[in-house]
Swiss-Prot record:
Pathway: Amino-acid biosynthesis; L-arginine biosynthesis; N(2)-acetyl-L-ornithine from L-glutamate: step 2/4
Disulphide-bonded residues: none
Record protein name field: Acetylglutamate kinase
InterPro entries associated with the record: AceGlu_kinase-like_sf (IPR036393), AcgluKinase_fam (IPR004662), ArgB (IPR037528), Asp/Glu/Uridylate_kinase (IPR001048)
Family (UniProt): Belongs to the acetylglutamate kinase family. ArgB subfamily.
Catalyzed chemical reaction(s): N-acetyl-L-glutamate + ATP = N-acetyl-L-glutamyl 5-phosphate + ADP
Length: 259
């Protein structure tokens, strides 16, 4: 449900964990985000760093339908990386770039509530599906010009759950009534035969998933984009850092025109 406290233009940015291993990428991301007005909300993943720590803790990473299977060891690794090293790295870069930023997780103040995620490909372990977002927590920060930097560890009835960062970003964008949610990846958009599709609708996305053109980790991104659209977000975009301000693939509802 959209919080009526603020109706200034709202942007949610999700950045993948793999990209955050690159110090140059983090510095440039922080520079761009720090200059944005109104200030955005930032959601981040953990990427390879989670898998490396998980292996160090004695558990081999595995994925089900493009989503990380999360047993107790994997959850510990995700918490340590997402709420620890990655969050600190991003917040530090933003502050150095001149912004005010605060790192929080979906557990803090019960920001993101979840239920166990069911998946047709099999059991995902402690992976959660967002059911509620306390948007007023984010508005409190945004209204004081503080960028929320959100780690996708969320709260279920029986404790913390790992949440796919794309799904978390979509749920947050929906709760904020965001004008746009931007998924920043290592590719310039949704590719079809090597070319970036400038615009896609739900029908086109479902067709591209069915024929295998959209696969792997791109599926949660487009699904999260569609969920956000269903909840009232005007548009979603998938792009890379270079295209973050205006390029990439725009995903829109059927029949809409996004300017």
């Amino acid at each position: 449900m959209t919080d009526p406290v603020s109706r200034q233009p709202t942007l949610v940015i999700k950045v993948g964990g793999n990209e955050l291993d690159d110090a140059t990428f983090v510095k440039e991301l922080a520079r761009i985000v720090a200059a944005m007005r109104p200030i955005p909300t930032l959601v981040h993943g953990g990427g390879k760093e989670i898998g490396v720590l998980q292996e160090t803790l004695g558990s081999a990473p595995r994925f089900v339908g493009g989503l990380r299977y999360t047993d107790a060891t994997a959850l510990t690794a995700a918490e340590m990386v997402l709420c620890g090293s990655v969050s600190t790295r991003l917040v530090a870069a933003l502050i150095v770039a001149g912004a005010d930023a605060l790192g929080i997780s979906g557990v803090d103040r019960g920001l993101i509530r979840v239920v166990k995620q069911e998946h047709p490909a099999g059991d995902l372990g402690r992976v959660g599906r967002p059911t509620a977002v306390r948007s007023e927590v984010l508005h409190e920060l945004l209204n004081h010009d503080v960028i929320p930097v959100i780690a996708p560890i969320a709260l279920g009835f029986d404790g913390p759950y790992n949440v796919n960062a794309d799904e978390a970003a979509g749920a947050i964008a929906a709760a904020l009534g965001a004008d746009e949610v931007v998924f920043v990846t290592n590719v310039p958009g949704v590719l079809v035969n090597g070319d970036v599709m400038p615009r896609l609708t739900r029908h086109e996305i479902e067709h591209l998933i069915a024929d295998g053109t959209i696969s792997g980790g791109m599926i949660p991104k487009v699904r999260a984009a569609l969920t956000a659209l269903d909840a009232g977000v005007r548009a979603a975009r998938i792009t890379n850092l270079e295209g973050m301000l205006e390029h990439g693939t725009i995903i829109i509802a059927e029949g809409e025109v996004h300017e």
